[in-house]
Amino acid sequence: MIESSAEHNTRLTRTWIYLALLIFIVGLTIFPFLGLQDFNTKGEPREAVVASTMLETGNWILPRNNGGETAYKPPMLHWCVATLSAPLGKVSEYTARIPSAAAATVLALMTFLFFAKRSDVQLGFWASLIFLTTFEVHRAAATCRVDMLLTLFIVGALFQLYQWYERDMKGVPLLAILFMSAGMLAKGPVAVFLPCFVTFIFLWIQSTEVLWRIVLRLMGVALLALLLPAIWYYAAYLQGGESFLQLVYEENVLRFLGKMTYASHENGWYYYFPILAAGLLPYTLTLLFSIFGRPRNGAKYKPVVKINFVRRITEGLRSMNSVELFSFLSILLIFIFYCIPKSKRSVYILPIYPFLSFYIAKLFAYLRNEKPFALRVTGALLAAIAFIVPFGVLAVCEGWIKPSIFHGKHAVENAFLMQNLAAMDFGFLRLLFIIAPIIAAVYYLFHFRDRFRIVQAIFILVFGLYISLEGLFLPLILNPRSDKNVAVRLEQISHQTQHPVYAYVHSTDANNPLHFFTINFYMRNRLHAFDGKQAEGQIIVGEEDLKQLEAQYPAFVFIQKEDLHHRSCDVGQNIGLYTFARKAADAQL
């Protein structure tokens, strides 16, 4: 149906309003909180150290850290982090996480524009908000990892290839090629293969051209996408030689075939089903509640998922409109692809989230008109959480809940967390973070009966909870687990003694060695790997690894200098600082 001029102008105005609102929401709920959490897992500092090494050495091709290792992934993330950090002269938690946050923001805007143009402006807006507020996306958007960047490049390429299809595949899809090139520089050939594979199946089902022409066109696109990355791969080969080629082969081919020389996130074929249910929270609740109840019109109930999903599959994929078909194929094919390798992580399937968000938005539109019960129950549960959490904080601060309730190996950490919470200085911002979910819950209670505002009220609830979580609770919970304070102490000791600090971590796999990544980052890449060539010095080691260290290096004497009273977030052991020296007989030799 052709829009009138007035309808077009109205649609354009709504698009700009929603776009501005989306930018405002992201600016309020993601970027202000990026630097509040210290690095507390080995994944983030491992990537950040590579960017630090780039700034320190000037080697932006294949830098090596103090441990003598090169990065396991191509350098796109490290380039972004190093570029953003260069004006400050160092990499911080905030600058390290900006690329992921920016990628999530750009992808949310692209998701909105893509679906708003091809379905409904409000539906596109809902899809973008759902995408941003799913648990998995929100978490990935605030971490220094490559996965959100890769997701942007894969989904961006898919969107651009669809637009190429709309143009009858005339010309060269330059933006799609650039997205795939950037994706290959982020993680490898998967960023080229997946967009081309999904588009091939889509075009084949649509029967837009004969099969061989589709294959040739997409092969040409893929080859063009390989040109820019080939420059870096060649330059990296000149520096890394055969070991670099072996790393590329292992990380891409052997990982997919499940024949890596070391175990890497190995899980069964069913792994992604529960992981997806968890990653889609809180909207998994809505999907669950939509099964129950009857439509408003009193018709015999049919499962909601049949509205635009199962029924259309049974009637034939070709009966779907092209946007729905393309979205469905993107979900199905990417999901199946990542189920094949043994190596599986929740973030691998992030590229299906924008398309799932579109279907969830369509479900919301149906539920709002026909089954608001499902939305109201979802909102009621979220509102209950929004009320309970602040009162839980009050109970801890008033001493109604005692640290003695905790038992097990994390009892000390949890008790320390409660003590921090009880002793916390409640300034204006922290009070705001605590009451934000209450304000959102009150708004929901005033509007939950209004079926035209209930979806809006649910989004406000979710954002209120995330603001409280990111602004207050996650830093409070996770920062005590970070190795940052240990790194500060080791820096002091190194400065006082005028000697470097060495580190030892026992690893059963030489191809995937563990390190104190977090300590090394906060020591500005000045933590040296112990290899037995040193005559004397000081070394940090986990209490369980100490026996392995003594057995591996019998020519040395290790004496504890200081118990650091901390369980490392990288190696999961209590760590201590030791002095070491060669035994007299060995020293004479």
Segments predicted by a language model, with ranges:
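Membrane-embedded architecture of ER/inner-membrane glycosylation machinery
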Residues: 2-12, 174, 293-589
